[in-house]
C-alpha cells in the first residue's frame, strides 16, 4: 500500500545488493528518490548511469524510442541478405505502434474499432518510412506525428490534367506509397487507408495523431528525439544503471515508461536467445518496476513474464493492489502475471483495504484446536453448587494462517514473504539505514542545454525515395548489360 515503505525497506537494499554484485538494473520511481540517493554511488562502483527523467525533462538524458528500429534498418541496408534484420525492425515498429494505440483506458474501440486497427497499421507504416528514408537526426517518433500531419493535405493527381470533368484527388499518403515497390511492407502495413476517401481517410489520420499526442511536448522532445548515450546491448554487457523518473499525476508520461520497459525486455530476450551460448544473459538484469500497476497496457507483457526468468532477467513489479492489474490486463491477464511470480512480498495494508482479504486467502489455513465449555445446573441448586454439571469439548478446525486484521496490523518493516517451495514467513526488513547503509551527498542532475529538434519533411522523404529508385534502376540496367561486373550490394530501399 501507499506509504508502506517499499522504497526505504526494499528498493534501496536491493539496489545496494545489485551494485555490490555488479549486475545491471533498471528502476522506475515517481519521486526521483532512487536517483538522488544512488546516482553518485553508481558512478563510484564504475556504473554507467542513465537518467531518464520525465518529471524534469531538461535534466534528463535522451532515449529515442525508434533507436532499435533505426539500428536494425541500418544493419539491413549494410547487408540486404540479412532479412532477419529488417524483420526485427518491423517487429519493433509493430510493437511500438501497438503500445501507442492501446494506451490506458483503451477498450478496443467498440464500434470504431476499424479506425483504431487502421491507425495501428498506419503508424507502423510511417515508423518504418521515417526509419528508412529520413536523415539520421530526423528519425524519431515526433517526425512520425509531423508526417501524419502533412498527410492531411491532398494533392491533385495527373488525371486532373486530362479529364477536367473527373476530378480525382490523390492523398499525400497515396502519392508516397505509390513510389515504393509493390512488395514493400511499408505499403502493406498501411492496409486500406491509402484507398480511403473523404471523412473515412481523415478519421484514420486524426485517430493516429490523437494516440501520438503523448509524445508532443517541447521539453520531452529533449529526451525522445535524440539517441541515447548507451545502446541496449550495453545494458546486458556492461554495468549500467537506468533510473526512470516519471510524474504519477501525468498519465500521458506513463505510456513512455511502459514503452521503454517493453523494448528493453523484448530486446533482452532476443539478445539472450541469439548471442549467448546458454540462451540466457551472462550478466543478470534486474527490473525494479515500481508503480507497475499504473502503467498502461504493455504489449506481450504476459509472454515476457513467462520467458524472462529463464533468460536471467528478473522482473520485480511493485503494485498497490491486484485490482490495478485486473483493470489493465483483465482477469485472465492478472492471473497469468500472478502465476509467473515465484516470490511474493506483501505488507503495509491500508485499514480500509480489501486487498488484505485476498492475501489472507493466498496464505492458506492452519489447523488449530478449538473447544467449548458448557455447564448444566440442577433445579434449585446454585451455579457452583454440588449439583452443577460441566462438560468440555475440543475440536480441530481450520483457521487462516493470518487473518486480514492481522495483516493490516503488521508494523512498519515487517513483510510477509511467500516463496515457491517453502512455507510463508514474516521477514524483518527495517529501514535501509538500520542495515548500515550510509548514503553520501545526493546526486544532483545538471540542466541540459536545449538543442533544437530536426523534424522530417514529407517533400524530403519523397525526394529521397525517388533518388534511391533512380539509383536502383541504373544499377539494374548496368547489371543486365554487364552481368559479370561486381555491384555494390547496399540496399536502396
Question: Where are these predicted regions, by residue range?
Answer:
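P-loop NTPase motor domains
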Residues: 1-313, 328, 339, 405-426, ...
Amino acid at each position: 500500500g501507499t506509504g508502506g515503505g517499499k522504497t526505504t525497506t526494499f528498493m534501496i537494499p536491493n539496489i545496494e545488493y545489485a551494485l555490490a554484485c555488479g549486475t545491471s538494473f533498471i528502476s522506475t520511481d515517481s519521486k526521483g528518490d532512487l536517483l538522488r540517493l544512488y546516482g553518485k554511488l553508481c558512478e563510484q562502483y564504475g556504473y554507467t548511469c542513465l537518467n531518464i527523467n520525465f518529471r524534469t525533462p531538461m535534466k534528463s538524458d535522451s532515449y529515442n524510442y525508434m533507436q532499435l528500429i533505426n539500428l536494425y534498418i541500418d544493419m539491413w541496408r549494410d547487408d540486404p541478405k540479412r532479412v532477419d534484420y529488417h524483420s526485427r525492425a518491423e517487429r519493433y515498429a509493430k510493437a511500438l505502434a501497438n503500445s501507442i494505440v492501446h494506451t490506458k483506458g483503451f477498450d478496443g474501440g467498440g464500434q470504431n474499432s476499424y479506425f483504431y486497427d487502421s491507425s495501428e497499421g498506419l503508424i507502423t507504416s510511417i515508423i518504418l518510412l521515417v526509419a528508412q528514408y529520413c536523415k539520421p537526426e530526423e528519425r524519431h517518433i515526433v517526425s512520425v506525428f509531423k508526417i501524419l500531419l502533412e498527410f492531411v493535405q491532398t494533392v491533385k493527381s495527373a488525371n486532373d490534367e486530362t479529364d477536367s470533368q473527373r476530378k480525382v484527388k490523390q492523398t499525400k499518403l497515396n502519392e508516397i506509397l505509390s513510389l515504393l515497390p509493390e512488395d514493400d511492407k511499408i505499403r502493406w502495413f498501411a492496409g486500406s487507408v491509402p484507398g480511403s476517401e473523404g471523412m473515412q481517410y481523415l478519421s484514420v489520420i486524426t485517430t493516429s495523431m490523437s494516440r501520438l499526442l503523448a509524445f508532443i511536448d517541447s521539453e520531452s522532445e529533449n529526451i525522445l528525439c535524440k539517441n541515447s548515450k548507451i545502446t541496449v546491448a550495453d545494458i546486458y554487457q556492461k554495468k549500467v544503471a537506468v533510473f526512470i523518473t516519471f510524474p504519477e499525476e501525468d498519465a500521458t508520461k506513463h505510456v513512455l515508461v511502459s514503452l521503454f520497459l517493453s523494448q528493453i525486455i523484448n530486446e533482452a530476450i532476443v539478445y539472450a536467445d541469439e548471442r549467448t551460448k546458454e540462451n540466457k544473459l551472462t550478466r543478470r538484469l534486474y527490473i525494479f518496476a515500481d508503480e507497475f500497476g499504473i502503467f498502461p497496457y504493455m504489449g506481450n507483457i504476459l509472454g515476457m513474464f513467462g520467458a524472462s526468468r529463464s533468460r536471467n532477467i528478473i522482473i520485480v513489479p511493485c503494485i498497490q493492489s491486484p485490482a490495478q492489474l485486473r483493470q489493465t490486463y483483465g482477469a485472465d491477464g492478472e492471473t497469468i502475471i500472478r502465476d509467473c511470480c515465484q516470490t511474493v512480498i506483501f505488507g503495509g495494508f491500508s485499514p480500509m483495504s480489501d486487498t488484505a482479504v485476498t492475501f489472507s486467502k493466498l496464505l492458506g489455513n492452519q489447523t488449530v484446536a478449538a473447544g467449548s465449555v458448557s455447564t448444566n445446573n440442577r433445579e434449585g441448586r446454585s451455579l457452583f453448587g454440588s449439583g452443577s454439571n460441566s462438560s468440555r469439548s475440543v475440536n480441530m478446525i481450520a483457521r487462516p494462517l493470518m487473518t486480514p486484521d492481522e495483516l493490516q496490523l503488521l508494523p512498519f518493516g515487517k513483510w510477509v514473504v511467500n516463496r515457491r517451495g517453502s512455507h510463508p514467513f514474516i521477514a524483518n526488513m527495517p529501514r535501509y539505514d538500520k542495515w548500515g547503509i550510509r548514503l553520501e551527498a545526493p546526486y544532483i542532475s545538471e540542466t541540459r542545454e536545449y538543442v533544437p529538434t530536426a523534424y522530417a519533411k514529407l517533400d524530403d522523404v519523397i525526394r529521397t525515395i525517388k533518388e534511391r529508385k533512380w539509383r536502383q534502376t541504373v544499377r539494374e540496367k548496368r547489371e543486365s548489360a554487364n552481368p559479370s561486373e561486381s555491384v555494390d550490394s547496399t540496399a536502396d530501399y
